């Protein structure tokens, strides 16, 4: 599906079922009762819609509004929607609660990603089949099921060493 095929007045969430931040935005949209269409970020969608909408970046999630605006970054998406949909706010009313809420979000968005990525990527014996199938399903959903996992190889290779790089993990550290 390309952006020119969006004839109605819906929100479109471009992302992946295995993206933590896509899940965050999807959960918010469900919580608020905001109708949306979820579009899997396949290679074609990245090339035809996401990259042009984000100045060449291959990032998800991206939310396309009914007015045709594209918003990237889960926090910015939620902030924009919160200002437009004020019922059932996710922002607590009191200042102390807002501080605690912001700290929880910071913890979840910035710090819990490290152990999540560690357990996703550093246990290949247990996770590799799932990873290849999940990325293959996202990137190459129209391929025959028997070979769809092959579509997951490139994204898996791209992400595989990111957790180690960010955490400063190397072979010497792992041997101790």
Q: Could you say what each language-model-derived stretch is?
A:
Residues 145-164, 168:
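A conserved mid-domain beta-alpha-beta active-site/ligand-binding segment of alpha/beta enzyme cores
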Residues 166-176:
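Loop-centered beta-sheet repeat module
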Residues 2-144:
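GST-like domain detector, emphasizing the conserved glutathione-binding G-site
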């Amino acid at each position: 599906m390309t952006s020119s095929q969006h004839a109605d007045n819906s929100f479109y969430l471009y992302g992946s079922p295995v993206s933590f931040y896509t899940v965050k935005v999807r959960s918010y949209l469900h919580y608020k009762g905001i109708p949306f269409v979820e579009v899997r970020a396949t290679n074609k969608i990245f090339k035809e819609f996401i990259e042009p909408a984000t100045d060449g970046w291959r990032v998800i999630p991206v939310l396309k509004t009914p007015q045709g605006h594209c918003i990237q970054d889960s926090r910015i998406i939620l902030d924009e929607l919160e200002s437009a949909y004020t019922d059932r706010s996710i922002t607590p009313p009191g200042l102390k609660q807002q501080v605690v809420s912001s700290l929880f979000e910071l913890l979840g968005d910035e710090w819990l990603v490290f152990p999540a990525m560690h357990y996703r990527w550093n246990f290949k014996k247990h996770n590799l089949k799932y990873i290849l199938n999940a990325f293959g399903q996202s990137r190459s959903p129209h391929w025959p099921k028997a070979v769809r996992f092959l579509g997951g190889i490139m994204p898996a290779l791209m992400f595989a060493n990111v957790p180690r790089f960010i955490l400063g993990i190397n072979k010497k550290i792992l041997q101790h």
